[in-house]
A protein has these predicted regions:
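Helix-loop-helix connectors at the membrane interface of multi-pass transporters/channels
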Residues: 105-137, 237-241, 246, 250-258, ...
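Transmembrane helix-boundary motif of multi-pass solute transporters/channels
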Residues: 6-46, 232-235, 245-249, 253-256
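Inter-helical loop and helix-membrane interface segments of multi-pass membrane transporters/permeases
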Residues: 29-34, 69-89, 102-162, 194-214, ...
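Membrane-interface "cap" regions at the ends of multi-pass membrane proteins
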Residues: 1-25, 54-59, 63-88, 239-243, ...
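Hydrophobic alpha-helical segments and their helix-loop junctions in multi-pass secondary transporters
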Residues: 101-123, 177-200, 268, 352-360, ...
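Loop-to-transmembrane helix boundary motifs in multi-pass membrane proteins
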Residues: 2-3, 9-10, 17, 143-144, ...
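Membrane-embedded translocation segments of transport machinery
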Residues: 2-4, 8, 166, 170-316, ...
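A generic transmembrane alpha-helix motif of multi-pass inner-membrane proteins
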Residues: 372-396, 415-444
């Protein structure tokens, strides 16, 4: 890359990549339905045992090589360089993800507009019908919103690491926290807040079962943007003498904190109106919450707009991180300018995004293997490419890279028994855990 992050810029950029839309609609619901703080404790343990371990492996690849994923594997492999370089192409998964991710952010833009104009639905059935119409029949709105988000995301990446990605995250991540804190202050005054606290934090170990352990294991891996080259790419711009162990723990903490703050805000309103939090996924936000915000009146419109804007912030910081790995690769390998690289990537992302829209419309509906094109991209990226990329990164660092090179990198920040423990987890425990998640995802 042409420039490096500042120390705080690196933390906020990677945290921005990790903090995504799932923090609002997946993580809080899983916590509440799976044992509250018992699930949180399980999630933290698995994050440190799996996510943290593989995160440091990918960080090591990026920091030592200072290359994009493809060239990083090729540079560091002592033999079979070409074969290992192909592992770097798991960054294609990031391109697939950003194609439908920008579309979902576009949906949120639509709901910001509905909030501001006071046109959110007042009834759950109406809300379901409105959202269903929007994604299955309203091509024009989806096209406009998707295009706006697409242009915004690619403009930010075009500015580079320092002036684009870092500036975005240095501004957007604190803004996200400010919005969440303001919404939390308002939520505290509501009767539903106590129920939300109990739902999220009162431990119920009886709810911990094999299914929940697998869910927590999956979250521990996927919530850190592993397996698609993002961490390798960002770490190539990690400033020297940065305590990356502390930085990684800070990133994990920020990700967890945003999820819990989102959960408190979301479920305060869910419980305030006597709803049952049985939805997980976009429906929780676009159907349940949209209805509740409208019921509150003018304050609800303001609150709804603030909430949806906070989701846009979380989504854009993640989307930006997914474009950078392939951009960096094209610049490194073919000597392209950043502008030309982004035009090529942009064409692919835009076509895939438009296909996602068309595959869900009633008039142009199509799919593969019983799934819409949208769901296919989601499944291929999250169930195949991401876990495969993480497993191969762990194997590469644990069995292919020289241990002495890792010791030198880690020496100022983690040594002795702690380094050896991380190394054992990296070689044997963490990859096996991800294999289990991968198998469980297919069986599900």
């Amino acid at each position: 890359m042409s420039s490096k992050f500042s120390k705080i810029g690196f933390i906020l950029a990677v945290a921005g990549s990790a903090v995504g839309l799932g923090n609002a609609w997946k993580f809080p619901t899983l916590v509440g339905q799976s044992g509250g703080s018992a699930f949180i404790l399980l999630y933290i343990i698995l994050t440190l045992g799996v996510g943290f371990v593989i995160f440091l492996a990918e960080l090591s690849i990026g920091k030592i090589s200072e290359k994009d994923p493809v060239n990083a594997y090729e540079k560091l492999a002592p033999s079979n360089k070409k074969a290992w370089s192909y592992v770097g192409f798991t960054m294609v998964g990031a391109i697939l993800i950003v194609s439908f991710y920008t579309l979902v952010i576009g949906w949120i833009v639509k709901y910001v507009f509905l909030s501001i104009t006071g046109n959110l639905p007042m009834d759950l059935e109406v809300s379901k019908a409105q959202f269903g119409f929007f994604i299955s029949e309203d091509f024009l709105s989806q096209f406009i919103c998707f295009t706006l988000v697409f242009l915004c995301v690619f403009y930010i990446v075009s500015k580079g690491v320092k002036n684009g990605i870092e500036k975005l995250n240095v501004w957007m991540m604190p803004s996200l926290f400010i919005l969440l804190i303001l919404m939390l202050v308002y939520a505290i005054s509501k009767d539903g807040f106590i129920m939300a606290v109990k739902f999220l934090f009162v431990p119920d170990f009886s709810k911990i079962n094999t299914s929940n352990v697998l869910e927590a294991l999956g979250l521990a891996f996927f919530s850190l943007s592993l397996g698609v080259g993002t961490i390798i790419t960002y770490s190539a711009s990690l400033p020297d003498k940065t305590n990356f162990i502390t930085s990684t723990l800070n990133i994990i903490f920020i990700n967890l904190l945003v999820g819990l703050l989102m959960g408190l805000v979301v479920f305060t309103f869910i419980f305030e109106f006597g709803y049952i939090p049985n939805q997980q996924g976009p429906g929780l936000v676009f159907i349940s919450l949209a209805t509740l915000f409208e019921k509150i009146g003018v304050i609800g419109c303001i609150f709804g707009a603030a909430f949806f804007i906070s989701l846009i912030f979380a989504g854009i910081t993640s989307a930006v991180s997914m474009i950078e790995p392939f951009t960096f690769y094209l610049i490194n390998t073919f000597g392209m300018s950043r502008k030309k690289a982004l035009i090529l990537i942009g064409i692919v992302v835009y076509i895939l995004g438009m296909l996602c829209i068309l595959s869900s419309l009633k008039s142009t509906q199509f799919g593969f293997f019983g799934m819409s094109f949208f769901d296919l991209l989601d499944s291929v990226s999250s169930k195949v490419i991401m876990p495969l990329g993480g497993i191969l990164a762990a194997i590469f660092v644990g069995f292919v890279m020289k241990k002495e090179a890792l010791k030198i990198l880690f020496k100022p920040y983690m040594r002795g028994i702690f380094f050896e423990l991380w190394y054992v987890f990296l070689r044997f425990i963490s990859p096996l855990a991800v294999v289990i998640v991968m198998i469980a995802a297919f069986l599900k």
